[in-house]
C-alpha cells in the first residue's frame, strides 16, 4: 500500500511540474505570427514565426544583410536600427556598437531575438542584394596556399558591384578531405612538409562567409575570388581547419555554388589624391579590383602605386597583369617585396616586410605622405604594421582605408 501511495504522489508531483512549465511557457514564449515593420513601408513588412533571430528572418524574406561571420556575432557587420520590439542590447553586441549608437537603436541582426512585433530601419542599398546559384568555371592554385575561384553568374543576370566590394558565399554541410585536393607539383613540397594532407573538414550545417572580389565591374558575368586555405596554426595543429576555405578548395569545374551580394564599403574616394595600395596574401583580391577599375574602366590619371608582400616568387601572382598595367599607364608603378626568397628565385628586387620596404624606398622621402590615400588588405600583422607606420608619418584615419577580409 505504501508503495502504491508513493507512486501516486510521485506522479502527481510530476504532473504538477508539467502544468507549471506549460503555464510559464504560455506566458513567456510568444505564439502565433509576429510582424516586422521595415522602413515604415507596409509593402516591406515581414510576417514570420517567433523564436529565431532577426538576421534569419530577414534572409527568409529575401532581405540579405551582410554577415561575414555567418551570424556568430563576431564580425559586427549585420547592423540594423531597431526602433521597437528588439529588447535590450546584449553584451555580445557592445564590442561593435557604442553606447551612443545603442541609444539610437543600432543592433546586430544576428543577436536580436524574435519575440514580438518589431519596427526596424534598413539602408536602402540592402534591397539591391540578391542571391545567385553560380557555376564554377575554374579553381586554380595561384600560390602555395591561395586559389583563384572563378564563378559564372547565371545567364541574363549581373552582380552590380563596385570595385572593393564583396559577396557572401554559402557552404553546405560537407565532409572534405585535404588528401583529395589536386595540388600542382610546384606547390606540393610545402603541403607535404607541413603534413597538410592529413586534415579534414566535417561540418553538419550551412556556413556563410564573405570574400572580396578580385575582378572589377567590367569583367562581366563572373565573380573571381582569391581564397587562402585556413589551415590550423603550427603551434596548435589539432584545431579544425577553416570551414569555408576547405569547402571552396574542394570545388571543381562545373560544381554549383551559391552567393549573395553585392556588399561593401571599401570603395575608392572620388578625389585627385595619390593612391597607395598595400597588399599581402589573399589581400591581393580587392587590390586587383581597385587598380584594374581605376586604370581600365575609369582611365584615372591619379598617381598610384601598388606594394605587395610575398614570401617567395612562388607566392607572386598576377605579375603579367600588373606589368602590363605599368607599361600602359605612366601614372602607375608596382613593386613586390619577398620576405623569404628561395635561392632558386635569383631575386634582385626588394626584400623584407612590405611596410618597411614601402617606408624605406618611398614614403620616407615623400614630400607629403599625409596627403596620400592608402588602401590596404592583407594578413592582420601586415595591416597593423602598415597602419602603425602611417600613423607615425602623420596620416589621418580618413586617408587609411582597410579591407579586413583578405588576410
From Swiss-Prot:
Keyword Metal-binding in annotation: yes
Q: Name one GO cellular component term.
A: plasma membrane
Q: Which InterPro entries match?
A: 2Fe-2S_ferredoxin-like_sf, 2Fe-2S_ferredoxin-type, Beta-grasp_dom_sf, Cbr1-like_FAD-bd_dom, FAD-bd_FR_type, Flavoprot_Pyr_Nucl_cyt_Rdtase, FNR_nucleotide-bd, NqrF
Q: What reaction does this catalyse?
A: a ubiquinone + n Na(+)(in) + NADH + H(+) = a ubiquinol + n Na(+)(out) + NAD(+)
Cofactor needs: [2Fe-2S] cluster; FAD
Q: What is one Gene Ontology biological process annotated in the Swiss-Prot or TrEMBL record?
A: sodium ion transport
Cofactor binding mode and count: Binds 1 [2Fe-2S] cluster.
Q: Where does [2Fe-2S] cluster bind?
A: 69, 75, 78, 110
Subcellular localization(s) per the UniProt record: Cell inner membrane
Q: Which Enzyme Commission number(s) are on file for it?
A: 7.2.1.1
Keyword field: 2Fe-2S, Cell inner membrane, Cell membrane, FAD, Flavoprotein, Ion transport, Iron, Iron-sulfur, Membrane, Metal-binding, NAD, Sodium, Sodium transport, Translocase, Transmembrane, Transmembrane helix, Transport, Ubiquinone
Kindly state the subunit structure of this protein: Composed of six subunits; NqrA, NqrB, NqrC, NqrD, NqrE and NqrF.
Q: Which family does it belong to?
A: Belongs to the NqrF family.
Function, please? NQR complex catalyzes the reduction of ubiquinone-1 to ubiquinol by two successive reactions, coupled with the transport of Na(+) ions from the cytoplasm to the periplasm. The first step is catalyzed by NqrF, which accepts electrons from NADH and reduces ubiquinone-1 to ubisemiquinone by a one-electron transfer pathway.
Q: What is this protein called?
A: Na(+)-translocating NADH-quinone reductase subunit F
Amino acid at each position: 500500500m505504501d508503495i502504491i501511495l508513493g507512486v501516486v504522489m510521485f506522479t502527481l508531483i510530476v504532473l504538477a511540474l508539467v502544468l507549471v512549465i506549460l503555464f510559464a511557457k504560455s506566458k513567456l514564449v510568444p505564439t502565433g505570427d509576429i510582424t516586422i515593420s521595415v522602413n515604415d513601408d507596409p509593402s516591406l513588412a515581414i510576417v514570420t514565426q517567433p523564436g529565431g533571430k532577426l538576421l534569419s528572418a530577414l534572409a527568409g524574406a529575401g532581405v540579405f544583410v551582410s554577415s561575414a561571420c555567418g551570424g556568430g556575432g563576431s564580425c559586427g557587420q549585420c547592423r540594423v536600427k531597431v526602433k521597437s520590439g528588439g529588447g535590450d542590447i546584449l553584451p555580445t553586441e557592445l564590442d561593435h556598437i557604442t553606447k551612443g549608437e545603442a541609444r539610437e537603436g543600432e543592433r546586430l541582426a544576428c543577436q536580436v531575438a524574435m519575440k514580438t512585433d518589431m519596427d526596424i530601419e534598413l539602408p536602402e542599398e540592402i534591397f539591391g542584394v540578391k542571391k545567385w546559384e553560380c557555376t564554377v568555371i575554374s579553381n586554380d592554385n595561384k600560390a602555395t596556399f591561395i586559389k583563384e575561384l572563378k564563378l559564372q553568374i547565371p545567364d541574363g543576370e549581373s552582380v552590380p558591384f563596385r570595385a572593393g566590394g564583396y559577396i557572401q558565399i554559402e557552404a553546405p554541410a560537407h565532409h572534405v578531405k585535404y588528401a583529395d585536393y589536386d595540388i600542382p607539383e610546384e606547390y606540393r613540397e610545402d603541403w607535404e612538409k607541413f603534413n597538410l594532407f592529413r586534415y579534414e573538414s566535417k561540418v553538419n550545417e550551412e556556413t556563410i562567409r564573405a570574400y572580396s572580389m578580385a575582378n572589377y565591374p567590367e569583367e562581366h558575368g563572373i565573380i573571381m575570388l582569391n581564397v587562402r586555405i585556413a589551415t590550423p596554426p603550427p603551434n596548435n595543429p589539432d584545431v579544425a581547419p577553416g570551414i569555408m576555405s576547405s569547402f571552396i578548395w574542394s570545388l571543381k569545374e562545373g560544381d554549383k555554388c551559391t552567393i549573395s551580394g553585392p556588399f561593401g564599403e571599401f570603395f575608392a574616394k572620388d578625389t585627385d589624391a595619390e593612391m597607395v595600395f598595400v597588399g599581402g596574401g589573399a589581400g591581393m583580391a580587392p587590390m586587383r579590383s581597385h587598380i584594374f577599375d581605376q586604370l581600365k574602366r575609369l582611365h584615372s590619371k591619379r598617381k598610384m602605386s601598388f606594394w605587395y608582400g610575398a614570401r617567395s616568387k612562388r607566392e607572386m601572382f598576377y605579375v603579367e597583369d600588373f606589368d602590363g598595367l605599368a607599361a600602359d599607364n605612366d601614372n602607375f608603378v608596382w613593386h613586390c617585396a619577398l620576405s623569404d626568397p628561395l635561392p632558386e628565385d635569383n631575386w634582385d628586387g626588394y626584400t623584407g616586410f612590405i611596410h618597411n620596404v614601402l617606408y624605406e624606398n618611398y614614403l620616407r622621402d615623400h614630400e607629403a605622405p599625409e596627403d596620400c590615400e592608402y588602401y590596404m588588405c592583407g594578413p592582420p600583422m601586415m595591416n597593423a604594421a602598415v597602419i602603425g607606420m602611417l600613423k607615425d608619418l602623420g596620416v589621418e584615419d580618413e586617408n587609411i582605408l582597410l579591407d579586413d577580409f583578405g588576410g
